Amino acid sequence: MLLEQIWGFLTAHPISVVTTILIVYLIHITLKPLNRVRRLGDVGLFFGKPELKGFYRERQLERLKLLRRVGDMPPVFPNGWYCVCESEKLANNQIMEITVLGQFLSLIRSESGAVYITDSYCPHIGANFNIGGRVVRDNCIQCPFHGWIFSAETGKCVEVPYDEGRIPEQAKVTTWPCIERNNNIYLWYHCDGAEPEWEIPEITEITDGFWHLGGRTEHEVMCHIQEIPENGADIAHLNYLHKSAPPVTKGSDIIKTDLSDPQPAVQHVWDGKWEVKSEEDRHCGVMHLNQFMTFWGYKVPLTSSKLVAEQHGPGIVHMLFDFGIWGKGVVFQTVTPEEALLQRVRFRIFSNIPWFFVKFFMTVEAMQFERDVFIWSNKKYIKSPLLVKNDGPIQKHRRWFSQFYTENSPKMLKDGSLSNQAKSIFDW
């Protein structure tokens, strides 16, 4: 009887039902935090007109990698901390495969919630912990092939289940230093085996629960890692590449956007500077940026923002925002070198800013970032650029960034291979 009444209502009021469903759906997607993910080839690369699809697209991507002129590049894996996972993506008692520094590793969360990173291959006969391995005894991992058990903390084998004899001394898996900070998990890498040389600052507003996750974006970018943070010192490009407002023009696609328009209808106006934080914190570079929007040359009220972006080493940026009456927050930009010329870039915002403003801000930020992706994915690295007076402190930034390269930093050879493989500081 009830089903008949429901069916009768649906058939009698189809427009009302469809409208209600549409409204509920729109509310859902509006309130849902932004999760914008772009894989390699989704943005930044040109696949012809008409655009290539499927197999032909993949083949063209391989050709682009092969034929692109990369230039005289610095080493490909600088020393520092790298984000390998967002905290909420790793559950207790889980082993997760991660890609970083040109290799697969195993990210582990124990039953009690601690995080560890180890090499992925069992030293017994070489099985992969990521494929069928499991967490046991709180903080140990068990190989899926023969059941050998290793401490995720020390890497040592603690049990061979079918043999009661003495465990071989060399039965050990390599571990990597890691830390969980600001709802991200980071790995420490140093090509000379040095212990962590600085700490990642803790944002107390996140720890104390005053700021909450409001959205994220993730991009795969085909370039050298140094190209991305160098943007912070390249002040001149802001008022050209990022001048027009993406939602009003052609979004992120610079092929379809007339960047030479001297007076876009809606325009971002930028002003900033970059400098080394201090001699004591020489691993940290700071960019101060002021921005507002104009409409036909007139400043738009309530669009002003001030940004202090602190870059901690080669792969972490903390962007501290003050939006005035809208509130405050931080955007984490993390750059992780998965391969020599493949970076995974994540943006995550934590704030007390209203949800609708956060979603708008992160969407515009992503579109602006994707304009840079078009440049990075197709440019070559020039060791000695031809700079003019108002280009900004690009050379100063390069001298600062060079501290993260040392004698054993892996270099990309002419055939595309690496001079040496990245390894844990515990392998020295």
Swiss-Prot record:
The protein's GO terms of the molecular function aspect are: 2 iron, 2 sulfur cluster binding; cholesterol 7-desaturase (NAD(P)H) activity; metal ion binding; oxidoreductase activity
Q: Which sequence ranges are marked TM in the entry?
A: 6-26
Q: What is the effect of changing C122A?
A: Abrogates cholesterol dehydrogenase activity
Where is the protein localized?
A: Membrane
Q: What does the record say about tissue specificity?
A: Expressed in intestine at all postembryonic stages, including dauer. Expression is reduced in daf-2 mutants.
Q: Does the keyword Protease apply?
A: no
The residues covered by the Rieske domain are: 81-187
- Name of the top EC class for this enzyme: oxidoreductase
Methyltransferase is among the record's keywords: no
Q: List the InterPro entries hit by this protein, alphabetically.
A: Cholesterol_7-desaturase (IPR050584), KshA-like_C (IPR045605), Rieske_2Fe-2S (IPR017941), Rieske_2Fe-2S_sf (IPR036922)
What reactions does this protein catalyze? cholesterol + NADPH + O2 + H(+) = 7-dehydrocholesterol + NADP(+) + 2 H2O; cholesterol + NADH + O2 + H(+) = 7-dehydrocholesterol + NAD(+) + 2 H2O
**Entry membrane topology:** Single-pass membrane protein
Q: Name one Pfam family in it.
A: KshA_C
Gene3D superfamilies, A to Z: Naphthalene 1,2-dioxygenase Alpha Subunit, Chain A, domain 1 (3.90.380.10), Rieske [2Fe-2S] iron-sulphur domain (2.102.10.10)
So which cofactors does this thing need?
[2Fe-2S] cluster
E.C. number, please?
1.14.19.21
| GO terms under cellular component | cytoplasm; membrane
UniProt-listed SUPFAM superfamilies: Bet v1-like (SSF55961), ISP domain (SSF50022)
Q: Provide the function of this protein.
A: Catalyzes the production of 7-dehydrocholesterol (7-DHC or cholesta-5,7-dien-3beta-ol) by inserting a double bond (desaturating) at the C7-C8 single bond of cholesterol. This reaction is the first step in the synthesis of the steroid hormone Delta(7)-dafachronic acid (one of the principal steroid hormones in nematodes). Dafachronic acids bind directly to the nuclear hormone receptor (NHR) daf-12, suppressing dauer formation and inducing reproductive growth.
Q: Which family does it belong to?
A: Belongs to the cholesterol 7-desaturase family.
- Please give the name of this protein: Cholesterol 7-desaturase
Name of the coding gene? daf-36
